[in-house]
Amino acid sequence: RLRRLIENNTLIRGIDVHNGLTGLIAEQISIDKEGFKKEFDFFWLSSLTDSTAKGKPDIELVDSTSRLNTIHDILEITTKPILFDADTGGIQEHFTYLVKTLERLGVSACVIEDKKGLKKNSLFGTEVKQKQEHIEVFSEKISSGKKALSGEDFMIIAKIESLILDQGMDDAIKR
């Protein structure tokens, strides 16, 4: 469903949800503007808010089982597309399993970033030196995820960290 929204609209609106309650609140938000109903088109489940809601730092500490349970809670109250923040995706074999599970649950897409090593959320600053995964390794991870899918609708979106890590636009385009 998210793919169709993107293809058919010039602008789509999403909001971060991190548990069933925030999903329920976001599901109910609707504004009537000049006779048109405005609401959120999709939900974003970020690792930052999911981790924070669990009292944990956003360093990929919250395991996939816990994050999948959060998705179950959100899916109980909505039929809106969900975009899942998969951080670095973990090791390739785990990422393949995660993608298959997300697709089976009905999640629309996941976003993986090209960082490697201990992940530190860049929203909290760049004082901790982060490194980018080698292009070939990152590309292979995405390819293995795509091969694991049973359909065409689920999307894997690459989040390239070149600009945040001061590597420049040329590096971002290359990646």
Could you tell me what each predicted segment is?
Residues 1-175:
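Alpha/beta enzyme core
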